[in-house]
């Protein structure tokens, strides 16, 4: 018995046929060897403080979760709080994913706390026309803390810088000079 298709059945059959042809004509997925690696970009264009700290740490954490090939941490900062800087450095050093610290664009700087962050990266890069350094610790408000306390703070900052400059194979004397020299 030959039965005619209803308009609904005919429309359904046409949709299925269309989808079958669309799927067949689709480009095949690339082999796993051709999948492009993911690089997570995080821009720190701010003073180093708790909000920017959380932003950077979240970006590094995300890169680790998705097994990214790398994190590109673009820096343009005058520096900031030591506590936030140390937390960012700790996140960089403990990351399973390599972190590339990059001072950019031209005209940017990674001064003070930014210098520590720059040198903590697995790879530290600077665009032409950028600068870094001036990482000598200063007190907020310029309070006089006395020579002994000032020396202790400077020695602690220099030891901290030395610890990851050595780990990353950087010029330790130059890194330490960025902390100890005041001018």
Model regions and ranges:
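Bacterial N-terminal signal peptides
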Residues: 11-22
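Soluble extramembrane regions of membrane proteins in the secretory/endomembrane system
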Residues: 21-183
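Bacterial N-terminal signal peptides that target proteins for export
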Residues: 1-12
């Amino acid at each position: 018995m030959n039965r005619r298709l209803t308009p609904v059945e005919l429309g359904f059959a046409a949709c299925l046929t269309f989808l079958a042809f669309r799927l067949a004509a689709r480009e095949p997925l690339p082999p796993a060897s051709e999948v492009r690696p993911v690089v997570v970009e995080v821009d720190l264009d701010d003073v180093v403080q708790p909000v920017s700290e959380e932003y950077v740490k979240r970006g590094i954490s995300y890169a680790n979760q998705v097994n990214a090939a790398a994190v590109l941490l673009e820096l343009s900062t005058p520096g900031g709080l030591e506590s936030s800087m140390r937390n960012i450095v700790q996140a960089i050093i403990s990351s399973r994913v390599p972190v590339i610290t990059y001072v950019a664009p031209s005209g940017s700087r990674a001064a003070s706390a930014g210098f520590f962050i720059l040198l903590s990266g697995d790879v530290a890069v600077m665009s032409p026309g950028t600068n870094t350094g001036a990482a000598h610790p200063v007190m907020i408000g310029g309070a006089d803390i006395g020579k002994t306390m000032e020396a202790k703070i400077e020695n602690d900052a220099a030891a901290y810088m030395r610890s990851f400059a050595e780990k990353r194979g950087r010029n330790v004397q130059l890194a330490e000079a960025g902390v100890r020299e005041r001018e």
